[in-house]
Amino acid sequence: MKTNGLWRCLAAASLCATAILLIGFGCTVKDMLFPYRGQVAIAAEPKAVWTEAGSLEKTSEIRVVALGDSLTKGTGDNTGDGYVKQVAAGLRKTTNKPVKILNNLAINGLRTDQLAERLDRDKGFAYALQKANLILLTIGGNDLFHTARARNAGRKLSAYSMEGLSKELPATLERFGRIIKELYAINSSAKIVYVGLYNPFYDIKELRSGSLEVQQWNEKAYTLLHNYPNMIMVPTFDLFEGKIADYLSDDHFHPNHNGYKRVASRILDSLN
């Protein structure tokens, strides 16, 4: 009798232990399949970087770094303002915030391959860009227009002058893609404004066809920029076409003061 009672106790204990194990296992599976919000199993929701990246609204001051070619340097403007200083002045008025131009890193004649190399190797370049919350950029014109400019320098113009522009497009766009990728790696939170290209030779019959290639450039550049939440493109094509004499300087390539003023106004419209 005692032996039977002992076996009954052991059997009851085993059943209880098994039930406890099954309940625990069931709870574990439930937690794995249906975790509640307070548990570590729920990953943090991603930040809305697409809408907030590059926003200047919450900044106490605007810190500008400009880079690129002679257009950003302001070549052709006899006042020395270019578009960069005019953008800064306009932002002071529209935002009522202090606006500082930290650096203008533009270099006359700079090409996409040269800028890509600087961004990749020049730590001083990268350091300056990291301090900005607004980056202004022009690049690509020297790559595409060098053939036409050479032929325009005291030589007879011909339709062949624009053939080089079309041939340069693919390689220049590839380098442009590298540039904006590197810019994003250096500073993913700053608003980056790329100023689109225009055809400075629109009023010359033999070179007017270049407008078609310039439009291709602008469209493809926009497509590349669209991949980054903090980058925008400001078109300038329509600002000069048909108005070359009014808004280009004597070199027939760079804007004059009023031309840069129109570019600055377009940039301000895109930022406000």
Functional labels for PLM-detected ranges:
Residues 250-272:
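Histidine-centered active-site loop/cap adjacent to the catalytic His
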Residues 179-212:
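Active-site segments of SGNH/GDSL-like serine hydrolases
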Residues 107-112, 154-172, 204-209:
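Surface-exposed cleft-lining segments at the edges of enzyme active sites
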Residues 39-106:
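Serine-esterase "nucleophile elbow" of acetyl-processing enzymes
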Residues 118-167:
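Oxyanion-hole/transition-state-stabilizing segment in secreted/luminal serine hydrolases
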Residues 1-65:
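N-terminal secretory targeting modules
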Residues 200-235:
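Substrate-gating cap/lid alpha-helix
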Residues 63-66, 101-106, 133-138, 191-195, ...:
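Structural recognition of the beta-strand scaffold that forms the well-ordered cores
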